[in-house]
Amino acid sequence: MELTPHEARVIGVLLEKEITTPEQYPLSLNSLTSGCNQKTSREPVLNLSESEVQNTLDALTKKRLISEQSGFGSRVVKYKHRFCNTEFSDLQLKSSELAVICLLLLRGPQTPGELRTRSNRLHDFHDVSEVEATLNELHRREAPLVMLLAKEPGKREARYRQLFSEVDANLVQALSSSLGAETASPQEKSALEARVCTLEQEVTELKAQLQSLLNN
């Protein structure tokens, strides 16, 4: 299963809202767009239009990762995921695993400590070791769902990333190491961080295009 950056954001929002605001789930296009563009709990912050979100939904529908639902007497179409833990899903996740994957989809690579701090509305992790155990379980699967990135110089913890939106891991690790160079100024580090994010998205989109060509 490979997701583009926009697809990862949409799936992440649907997973999050299903848990945190079940009374509002499934989501309308308007609600889903607002969730994708939230200024908090999202990295990077996006500014997607409804048409961009709709195009993403259409792509996810073709991948059978979402379904539409129309309410009785309502013309508003709402969307729910088929990403995991449904009768149509091959992927089954425990609540702890779901929380970690959701956060990685919404906020990119994170340390176990960051995941524990940010997961309080999704799952109650008692301590960081419980998060680490969950990450290990996700990594030890027959088809790993997360990977450990190279530790950045000067950082106490290494970060993990999800493997649904695939990137060149060696490229990311090399650029991540550059971020901690003692000679780099704050402005240079910021520019490198932006470059890493851009390259991740470009590689993911190129792989999606290649897969589409191979399938045709």
Swiss-Prot record:
Protein name according to UniProt: UPF0502 protein Spea_2482
Species, as recorded: Shewanella pealeana (strain ATCC 700345 / ANG-SQ1)
PANTHER family in the record: UPF0502 PROTEIN YCEH
UniProt record similarity statement: Belongs to the UPF0502 family.
HAMAP family referenced in this protein's UniProt entry, alphabetically: UPF0502
Listed InterPro entries: DUF480, WH-like_DNA-bd_sf, WH_DNA-bd_sf
